[in-house]
Amino acid sequence: MILDMTIPVSACGPSFHIQHVCTDAPSFKPAQRADIVRLEKAILDLNGGHDGADQCHLTHHFAPKVYGREILLPAGSDVVGKIHRHAHLNVIVKGRALVATEFGSHEVKAGDIFVSEPGTKRAVHAIEDTVWMTIHPNEADTQDLEQIEEYVIAPSYGALSFEDTKKVGVA
């Protein structure tokens, strides 16, 4: 079976069709890093440089030295995640989605909990309305989202630390 993904005009809004990014669902092939980056660029180009994330419902959670980020991915939406600097927990709170990374591809569903390694970047297709939560260290114990994102998110693979780049095969 072929899974055809769509590229949204806004990350969680209307979309147009693009030929397969992933094949043979539910155990489709891993995506190449370059394919995921191209998909992300296409989304940005369609949205005038804007990723459309503000159209997805995003909730922030804070506990001492812990930051949780929860996003609602509407059924049928396709999104590309950020590159994270550190290992962190992922919790699929609700729904089902197909996920492709350079390390493998699989389906995630409500109740799944897993660790993302530093440098992981995902292309995600929400099969159902999906609530996805990531849990990150917040060593500064701040609620300043700009400061948290600077610590948590790498703007590019080149921005990862040397140790992290060895883990993802960049160094």
Q: Language-model features: where?
A:
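A short, N-terminal "cap"/entry segment at the start of jelly-roll beta-barrel domains
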Residues: M1-E70, E150, A159-A171
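Glycine- and acidic-residue-biased ligand/ion/polar-headgroup-sensing regions
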Residues: R85-F103
